[in-house]
């Protein structure tokens, strides 16, 4: 796992289009330290346990998050689920998974990711989820279709901003994970839950500790 943040940082800094005083590059000392850390480790590196995750997301506003959490308790009881619901402040739609590593993300990487995300131009938009269902990995989620086009557009633009070689749209199924449970639930319609997406958030998650830190917030254009 070790080194994913490093390679991501190297990739971002090799990409064209951000030259100038706003572009921050890793220090030579930082680069040498990373080379020493990952050079010649072989199987040892593979055995390291990932502790830190970075991902870009869209979050519901606090009022909507509280509403989702309240509904989750009812859906959990109605479907006989036993998994622990996510905290309201942890509810989100993942846009792009940056990576997992065995150390906290360096400031240089956070800065580079923030700069790339800031290059995404898109107005605030409304999202609406109208069903619940089981998803991969035992997740019980909010899902939708027709009213999630804005998330598809934002995810593609953000992916292009982060990718040295923008290409066709990646597979992306917008959803909000509510809890995890081994019992699978077929798709069920619900009264729609909606909010206005106003910003992109870069989240630093401490794996296994249920700790999320919003390290960067990039506002979308306001109408």
Give the residues covered by each predicted segment.
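Histidine-dependent nucleotide/RNA phosphoesterase domain, centered on the 2H-phosphoesterase fold
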Residues: 2-223
């Amino acid at each position: 796992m070790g080194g994913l943040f490093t390679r991501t940082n190297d990739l971002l800094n090799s990409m064209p289009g951000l030259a100038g005083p706003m572009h921050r590059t890793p220090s030579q000392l930082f680069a040498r330290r990373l080379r020493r850390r990952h050079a010649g480790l072989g199987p040892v590196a593979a055995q390291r346990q990932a502790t830190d995750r970075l991902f870009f997301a869209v979050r519901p506003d606090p009022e909507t998050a509280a509403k989702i959490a309240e509904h989750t308790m009812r859906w959990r009881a109605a479907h006989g689920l036993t998994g622990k619901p996510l905290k309201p402040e942890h509810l989100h739609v993942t846009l792009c998974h940056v990576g997992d590593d065995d150390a906290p993300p360096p400031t240089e990487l956070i800065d580079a990711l923030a700069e790339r995300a800031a290059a995404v131009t898109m107005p605030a938009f409304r999202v609406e989820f109208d069903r619940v269902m089981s998803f991969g990995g035992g997740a019980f989620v909010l899902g939708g279709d027709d009213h999630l086009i804005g998330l598809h557009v934002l995810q593609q633009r953000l992916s292009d901003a982060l990718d040295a070689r923008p290409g066709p749209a990646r597979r992306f199924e917008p959803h909000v994970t509510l809890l995890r449970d081994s019992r699978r639930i077929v798709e069920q319609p619900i009264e729609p839950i909606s909010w206005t997406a106003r910003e992109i958030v870069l989240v630093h998650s401490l794996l296994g500790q249920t700790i999320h830190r919003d390290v960067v917030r990039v506002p979308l254009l306001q109408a």
